């Protein structure tokens, strides 16, 4: 099982978009995936069709009231589950302030996670192959991936995500100011690795909102790759990190689909955004070939993710 925290303390860089659509791509590829929404804004929950209204069980209850993870987890689609967030989560930082070990509450809850049983809660209005109320073997260890969507901060909620994860994915918009914020984020992962979670590693950077036609975007990616190359052989959590070759291009469909409570594959499966996240999922899985991603789409040259070389733009 791979436990991945998707983090960046800057907002609007593609964290939730990447968490949700990568999860959907992996699930459609046959992997069992659970999304944990640790953002008080609950954008990942809304993106997956679960509207936070303050009454539904959520990750807040896991962190503050010691509820089992299985009691709040919902099945969203085939192979895809969600531990939703709620507006109440905004108060968790204060409520947990005096709790010893508050940074590892989520990790301990996942360690105690058992089979869903009666806690299985399918989202109303969705079609599933499995009947509501059926006993499901979906304890934490049965998942292939757990993706945690973090809020735009480096507070106790994000620390919980880092403590409960093995890997970190960093969505990054290719602007120079984003590189300045990256150093603080990497410092935080190093601190967590030293004091809380020695196995934590930064696996990669996902370039989002990419425009291959701008020189700035290309320069930022080049600088980022150069920085990561210099870290090879060091004792830092990012010593083996890479910039994913798949870059998520600007695409209006990616901006539209959250308002419909759908992933890009449910909203616009033939869009460039779907092609990009399909390719990213294949890269995460280590797959190669012309048929990429969960939708088994053949990506046309004009839709294929592009990377820059000395000879121009080529499909990856």
Region locations from a protein language model:
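P-loop NTP-binding core
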Residues: 1-316
């Amino acid at each position: 099982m791979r436990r991945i925290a998707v983090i960046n303390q800057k907002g609007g860089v593609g964290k939730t978009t990447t968490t949700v659509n990568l999860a959907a791509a992996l699930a459609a590829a046959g992997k069992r995936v659970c999304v944990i929404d640790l953002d008080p804004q609950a954008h990942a929950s809304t993106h997956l069709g679960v509207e936070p209204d303050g009454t539904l069980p959520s990750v807040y209850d896991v962190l503050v009231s010691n509820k089992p993870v299985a009691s709040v987890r919902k099945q969203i689609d085939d192979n895809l589950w969600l531990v939703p967030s709620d507006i109440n989560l905004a108060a968790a930082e204060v409520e947990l302030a005096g709790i010893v070990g508050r940074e590892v509450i989520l990790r301990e809850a996942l360690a105690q996670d058992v089979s869903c049983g009666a806690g299985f809660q399918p989202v109303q209005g969705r079609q599933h192959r499995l009947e509501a109320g059926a006993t499901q073997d979906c304890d934490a260890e049965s998942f292939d991936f757990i993706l945690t969507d973090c809020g735009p901060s480096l507070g106790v909620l994000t620390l919980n995500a880092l403590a409960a994860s093995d890997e970190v994915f960093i969505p990054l918009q290719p602007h120079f100011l984003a590189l300045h914020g990256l150093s603080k984020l990497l410092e935080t992962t190093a601190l967590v690795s030293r004091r809380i979670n020695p196995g934590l590693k930064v696996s990669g950077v996902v370039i989002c909102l990419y425009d291959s036609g701008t020189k700035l975007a290309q320069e930022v990616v080049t600088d980022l790759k150069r920085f990561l190359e210099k870290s090879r052989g060091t004792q830092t959590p990012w010593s083996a990190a890479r910039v994913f070759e798949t870059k998520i291009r600007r695409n209006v469909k990616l901006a539209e689909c959250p308002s419909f409570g759908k992933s890009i594959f449910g909203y616009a499966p033939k869009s460039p955004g779907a092609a990009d996240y399909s390719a990213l999922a294949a890269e995460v899985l280590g797959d190669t070939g012309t048929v990429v991603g969960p939708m088994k789409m053949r990506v046309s040259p004009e839709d294929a993710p592009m990377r820059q070389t000395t000879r121009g733009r080529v499909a990856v």
